[in-house]
Swiss-Prot record:
This is Interleukin-1 family member 10. Belongs to the IL-1 family. Interacts with cargo receptor TMED10; the interaction mediates the translocation from the cytoplasm into the ERGIC (endoplasmic reticulum-Golgi intermediate compartment) and thereby secretion. The gene is Il1f10. Its main location: cytoplasm. It comes from Mus musculus (Mouse).
Length: 152
């Protein structure tokens, strides 16, 4: 678990109450009751090196031992979990933009925009048990809106 006092843990759900979880190195979205898994307790820390008005955050999984990253490929931006400790990112020990997401408020919901790929947002899959992706979507939808439920 992350030892920094400002670390906050959340269970992140979509509009249909499906929660984020990790399995086999992938970030998935599903129903904990029917999919037989435990929701991921996502550790969130701010990225102090970017404009605070955009609410830049790091998303740490598995107790903060790996983080969600946006990687540029020929096919477009790709989400992946990387073995990078969230505390190291917070302390500024590595290039951090690809691990940063801007938390955009929509009332009680949020959209998560990849700092490394402006205009690309975290998006829940259309099919169950598929990886969470990035989409270039200008308007909010139920696939790009997420709710943060405090955990611990």
């Amino acid at each position: 678990m992350c030892s920094l006092p400002m670390a906050r843990y959340y269970i992140i759900k979509d509009a249909h109450q499906k929660a984020l979880y990790t399995r086999n190195g992938q970030l998935l979205l599903g129903d904990p009751d029917s999919d037989n898994y435990s929701p991921e307790k996502v550790c969130i820390l701010p990225n102090r090196g970017l404009d605070r008005s955009k609410v830049p955050i790091f998303l740490g999984m598995q107790g903060g031992s790996c983080c969600l990253a946006c990687v540029k490929t020929r096919e477009g931006p790709l989400l992946q979990l990387e073995d990078v400790n969230i505390e190291d990112l917070y302390k500024g020990g590595e290039q951090t933009t690809r691990f940063t997401f801007f938390q955009r408020s929509l009332g009680s919901a949020f959209r998560l925009e990849a700092a490394a790929c402006p205009g690309w947002f975290l998006c829940g899959p259309a099919e169950p048990q598929q990886p969470v992706q990035l989409t270039k979507e200008s308007e909010p939808s139920t696939h790009t809106e997420f709710y943060f439920e405090m955990s611990r």
